[in-house]
Amino acid sequence: MLRQVLHRGLRTCFSRLGHFIASHPVFFASAPVLISILLGASFSRYQVEESVEHLLAPQHSLAKIERNLVNSLFPVNRSKHRLYSDLQTPGRYGRVIVTSYQKANMLDQHHTDLILKLHTAVTKIQVPRPGFNYTFAHICVLNNDKTCIVDDIVHVLEELKNARATNRTNFAITYPITHLKDGRAVYNGHQLGGVTVHSKDRVKSAEAIQLTYYLQSINSLNDMVAERWESSFCDTVKLFQKSNSKVKIYPYTSSSLREDFQKTSRVSERYLVTSLILVVTMAILCCSMQDCVRSKPWLGLLGLVTISLATLTAAGIINLTGGKYNSTFLGVPFVMLGHGLYGTFEMLSSWRKTREDQHVKERTAEVYADSMLSFSLTTAMYLVTFGIGASPFTNIEAARIFCCNSCIAILFNYLYVLSFYGSSLVFTGYIENNYQHSIFCRKVPKPDVLQEKPAWYRFLLTARFSEETAEGEEANTYESHLLVCFLKRYYCDWITNTYVKPFVVLFYLIYISFALMGYLQVSEGSDLSNIVATATQTIEYTTAHQKYFNNYSPVIGFYIYESIEYWNSSVQEDVLEYTKGFVRISWFESYLNYLRKLNVSTDLPKKNFTDMLRNSFLKTPQFSHFQEDIIFSKKYNDEVDVVASRMFLVAKTMETNREELYDLLETLRRLSVTSKVKFIVFNPSFVYMDRYASSLGAPLHNSCISALFLLFFSAFLVADSLINVWITLTVVSVEFGVIGFMTLWKVELDCISVLCLIYGINYTIDNCAPLLSTFVLGKDFTRTKWVKNALEVHGVAILQSYLCYIVGLFPLAAVPSNLTCTLFRCLFLIAFVTFFHCFAILPVILTFLPPSKKKRKEKKNPENREEIECVEMVDIDSTRVVDQITTV
């Protein structure tokens, strides 16, 4: 009873609102336009988000805390050349991979000379500034001896060249650790790629060589010069490529990921314009019919104008509040399109059900009462699900900003549909009531006048006048609409046919089977190359890197951040045990080996251990570089202690798998908690992958929970709680299918796909809720009858919005970008699976599942008695008289 009272009360409120808007259409049409123009003017403050880490790395993670601790001990910007990472290296740098088209050995004489020539060209790059020309020597990261840090492979190649010049045959390169001329042991696993080795790790050949040039960015001027140097670096490498066509060179800089991420927006522009044109065309066609008076092409266009105004308003608010644009915002218009188009088409469908002899204000009031309640509830669902995604619970900033922008856009879209589109409906209603042409707004002449006109004129001005319509045919004036005719005359009977139902059930079982197969293979995508445009430096570099340099993980820093008893043999065993199984670049292990070579016990007293470390080991040229890895402190009694130190570890991997690397990170962290030695591990790439899985799933998880809560509480607003049960089951079925087929279509669960899945919850409710509501609330007739009725009432609006949405999505598939490719595949699957449920699964399943539609037996009473009438029927052929008993 309470539900019915609330339901009727809300319908009455919307009816009065519709009547009020119909009474003041000019104001409600102009106000949204003025607001959009005023807020849209804020595009003069348009800004683009520069930091990819800010957008895509989890905001709250242990890796960021570890980075701060590491920075306080050993500044990452100074040690980034030793903490190698592919795409996540901090600061400014230029990087290049050199390979050969014929898979030649890059260590032979020709290619060695070529690479050294490229190195010389890079170091001579000049960045002109007023009064001074900066070269690499001026902006490079410096060693302790004030020389530029250059990759060790350059020294190896120079030694190799000198050995060939002097005919020395005893020079050998080992892999992944080799020794330089001065005796230093260095790691070259990320500098030599595609390596073939002899016995004892001696390198036979290498198919690729990677060089990295690290730059300073300690102040704004330095950063600006470094940025320009990176640009000149790419130009120099490309020129070198043109003059040496037998080698393939892949340049990459610290700016490449950011530029290629934002490049998606630029390459998408013409495709989005094409999409807009297609949607406008389809919307106009969907609202058109042969009857030139009742056709509503302008409403199709104005529906898109409504969505555009709402999007513009939301963008203006984001700009005014200091928000910055990023390429993930490309999905917002499609979120708006899916929600806004259905709302406008549902209003138009409700308009067609009103009586033509009513006044426009009364018809508008009926439209609002009929369609705005369900549209308001679905809008509330959008606001709740995206609102939870926009909350601080969302740990990935790109997802939070997207949800926040979508919330604002959805809210204004709802308000503008109520006001702008509603007033547009009023204006077209007056045009219809005055029998004016729906496009040209010219009075349509009566049929007797049209008979005297040419055929083309009669075709353009075909209309059905009320005088031609019989009293009982009033409701059928819109049946000449193609989609209405198709659903009512053909599709509804076909889908509910007894012989069709088994095939639909079979298709659904196949759908569930394939969805389950994909669901069991879901993988999380934390690869940053999945969000950039294709045919870019990032994609080319990443492809080459994965091909040639996938044998070892990024270099992991192993930091002991408190003073421990390094001289104690048990502590030594613990430290060696923790690092066992890794390729190690360790001062500690080198020092212990140094002591053994001197026939000195490693179990020395503290003072002797420390003094020999400082005064002997670190003064030896081949070990002097380890001074950067140890922090000493003097106590009050002049006793020296090692307060912190670091080592570098590299894991052997079959391929650079981020999930495998994350598992390694978690294993080392668990070990650090239980071990006697307090240490942390860090690599710049950990900032992106730490808690990425939980951060990624949190918005979807929270949105699903909030959607369930909203469906539960909205059960008091709908006339029957069974509606919400059916909606929940439908959403689960759709989301399960989308996730499964998304995986089979090689789409990983990343930031973009999670946002699409949140949208999929709302899109499903948008389209399925009216169908289910009409079916559940239907009484007296059979299930089949109410399934047909639900399709006839709401199917046209669903079909119209689906057609417009799909034609708008297709150009997105052609955009040369991984981000838009993910966006297209997810949105297409959401639309297709939802359509499949609306027009196939639900119409069939509802015909044999609850609620029951059996006619309740009426109590016998004096006012409701059956009257029996005898009717005599004469059989003409046999002249027999037949008595037939009929019930009246």
From Swiss-Prot:
Domain SSD: 268-427
Glycan attachment residues as annotated in the record: N77, N133, N167, N319, N326, N568, N599, N608, N762, N818
Outcome of swapping K181T: No effect on post-translational processing
Major place of residence: membrane
Gene Ontology CC terms, in alphabetical order: dendritic spine; plasma membrane; synapse
Expressed in which tissues: Broadly expressed in the brain. Selectively expressed in the thalamic reticular nucleus (TRN) in early development and continues to be enriched in this structure throughout adult life.
Disulfide bonds: none
Location of the protein in the cell: Cell membrane; Cell projection, Dendritic spine
Biological processes per GO annotation: cognition; excitatory chemical synaptic transmission; inhibitory chemical synaptic transmission; long-term memory; short-term memory; smoothened signaling pathway; social behavior; thalamus development
TM annotation in the entry: 20-40, 273-293, 298-318, 328-348, 373-393, 407-427, 502-522, 707-727, 738-758, 795-815, 826-846
Family assignment from sequence similarity: Belongs to the patched family.
Job description of the protein: Required for the development and function of the thalamic reticular nucleus (TRN), a part of the thalamus that is critical for thalamocortical transmission, generation of sleep rhythms, sensorimotor processing and attention. Can bind cholesterol in vitro.
The protein's name in its UniProt record: Patched domain-containing protein 1
Gene: ptchd1
